[in-house]
């Protein structure tokens, strides 16, 4: 399975002017934990890091430190996540038939989640890892007056990985560029073309590290995970 990792996000909500994936989590950059999960995944065989050129030396140093056994390539990103994933798709090896796309900021995803998602592509054209929404959601207007309350049983919070068959995803991206569509994830492109996208159950701990509070929570989760795995080898040891 081929894995693309968009890794160009800035840390403005972290109060930082640099790539947030360079921030440290338990002694390693955020991106390191994503890469270690991919390394420990049974299914992942190829990894593409999509980032800005200014970060390439940092990621090269990180890769030398981690000494991963799987091939990892650097792919120059675009101005938006959508453009970056498009560039990533063009850089896939010719034999790639399926792809997982996983945000580098979701650095607590486990190898088991990656494997479960890879297996889902035996059955689906496209899918999104997601978890059921726990909170009651309110729809509001521009004045913050509540307009409605959706049925919570039908609401899922989208995560990554998202996975797709490569050929239809490339077609979706090409049409999106032609039509000028701007979307926040790849599943939305599938949806615009009425292609089926399914849900694969994600992980509650698979949070996206965006704010200082997220980073603090991630530290606690990772510390517990490391303690639990302290007697084993592999991811998290």
Swiss-Prot record:
Enzyme Commission number, as recorded: 2.7.7.60
Gene transcribed to yield this protein: ispD
Annotated site (Positions MEP for the nucleophilic attack): 152, 208
InterPro entries the UniProt entry points to: IspD (IPR001228), IspD/TarI (IPR034683), IspD/TarI_cytidylyltransf_bact (IPR050088), ISPD_synthase_CS (IPR018294), Nucleotide-diphossugar_trans (IPR029044)
Pathway(s) of this molecule: Isoprenoid biosynthesis; isopentenyl diphosphate biosynthesis via DXP pathway; isopentenyl diphosphate from 1-deoxy-D-xylulose 5-phosphate: step 2/6
Organism for this UniProt entry: Acaryochloris marina (strain MBIC 11017)
Keywords: Isoprene biosynthesis, Nucleotidyltransferase, Transferase
Function: Catalyzes the formation of 4-diphosphocytidyl-2-C-methyl-D-erythritol from CTP and 2-C-methyl-D-erythritol 4-phosphate (MEP).
Annotated Pfam families: IspD
Record-level GO BP terms: isopentenyl diphosphate biosynthetic process, methylerythritol 4-phosphate pathway
Protein family according to the UniProt entry: Belongs to the IspD/TarI cytidylyltransferase family. IspD subfamily.
PROSITE patterns, alphabetized: ISPD
Annotated catalysed reactions: 2-C-methyl-D-erythritol 4-phosphate + CTP + H(+) = 4-CDP-2-C-methyl-D-erythritol + diphosphate
Name under which the protein is recorded: 2-C-methyl-D-erythritol 4-phosphate cytidylyltransferase
